[in-house]
Amino acid sequence: MMPSESGDESLEQPAAQVGTGAASAVATAGAAGGGPDLEASSASLGRHQSRLSWPQVKRLDALLKEPIPIHGRGNFPTLSVQPQQIVQVVRSSLEEQGLHVHSVRLHGSAASHVLHPESGLGYKDLDLVFQMDLQSEASFQLTKAVVLACLLDFLPAGVSRAKITPLTLKEAYVQKLVKVCTDLDRWSLISLSNKSGKNVELKFVDSVRRQFEFSIDSFQIILDSLLLFGQCSSTPMSEAFHPTVTGESLYGDFAEALEHLQHRVIATRSPEEIRGGGLLKYCHLLVRGFRPRPSTDVRALQRYMCSRFFIDFPDPVEQRRILERYLEAHFGGAEAARRYACLVTLHRVVNESTVCLMSHERRQTLDLITMLALQALAEQGPAAMAALAWRRPGSDGVVPATVNYYVTPMQPLLPRAHSYPTWLPCN
């Protein structure tokens, strides 16, 4: 879809005129509480959407203006990037190249943090979604070229740009490049490196089957109005004068999903569609104090997730790589003590809910989880290394994050699973 001439002309309006347009989207003073005014929102928005409150808009603005270091490999300097800056530069460059961006959204854990920072989950990656048309291979290549070219704008002053090529920038600053092009999924991802794990992830989406695992990570916040306000208005934001920002839940019901986030509830729709990583996210949520909704068929949910995990990651080497990467991303630094609890929880779920595996394959995965749990236990310090510590999870599946109990060293860390003599039927 090419931008129309009239659309280009509208971008060239005088700042004062555009500022007036931005002001028309300003939310007047509303409730100063942490949650959106759902009653007011329902008048003009669907159930899957809601307007953000003033405190939420402030958190969003602060998040988009917080400088994030993009660490270079080798001798390349560290780039200091504000998320709103890179969004504006990339979007403008895409439009100049004839690729129209329908909207830009904040997705995932960062969006959940903006809506309810007291969930205890925090956020790592900053997921920025550009909704656009990607109908050809050329459009995929052009988005990658645009992002790499934009990185030049963020190099520190004094750095010679003459001999820096796009390939050089990719090797220096890109953590991950992904392209998915199927009948149902057309999107690409460029993840920019950050040593602390807070990667800036630019995702260019034409279509995708599913963008969430549970209701609490289904939120997207549309950034267009806030970005336009920052560009066009010289008046600082206030409770009485700020842009109207809309949030959306891909789960379907915004109010219900927000309530799940506030009360630490695990809920989802069509669990059979959850990808393999959903099993790790589920165990992560259990360790953080989240609990399945009472009406949930927990055994069925766990069976779906276990089955999908082994479909997506059948090889033990790949399983280990995925587990280690997830633990490093979500339980690094001060959170490292929770790795043991997460692995014990994962062992329990896999032990209870895995079907469609030969007994030796199942045992192989359980042994891998046991070994990683032992490593995590040893990393907690000399006291934990002195004995193998084990405590069965309670009825709610909770395992303490730190070890302050001891048992005879001869007792195994994790209970040995019952072996199954032959192939288990898939239900």
UniProtKB/Swiss-Prot annotation:
Residues 1-11 have a biased composition (Acidic residues). Residues 1-46 are annotated as: Disordered. GO terms for cellular component: cytoplasm; nucleus. Keywords: Cytoplasm, Nucleotidyltransferase, Nucleus, Transferase. Residues 15-30 have a biased composition (Low complexity). It is found in: Cytoplasm; Nucleus. It is an enzyme of class 2 (transferase). It comes from the Eukaryota. It holds the Pfam family NTP_transf_7. GO terms for biological process: mRNA stabilization; negative regulation of apoptotic process; negative regulation of cell cycle; negative regulation of cell population proliferation; positive regulation of translation. One of its GO terms (molecular function) is poly(A) RNA polymerase activity. It catalyses: RNA(n) + ATP = RNA(n)-3'-adenine ribonucleotide + diphosphate. Its EC number is 2.7.7.19. Catalyzes the transfer of one adenosine molecule from an ATP to an mRNA poly(A) tail bearing a 3'-OH terminal group in an ATP hydrolysis-dependent manner. May be involved in maintaining the translation efficiency of at least some genes through preventing degradation of their mRNAs. Prefers RNA molecules that are adenosine-rich close to 3'-end. In addition, may inhibit cell proliferation and cell cycle progression through ubiquitination of beta-catenin/CTNNB1. PANTHER family: PRION-LIKE- Q/N-RICH -DOMAIN-BEARING PROTEIN PROTEIN 44 (PTHR12974), TERMINAL NUCLEOTIDYLTRANSFERASE 5B (PTHR12974:SF46). Belongs to the TENT family. This is Terminal nucleotidyltransferase 5B.
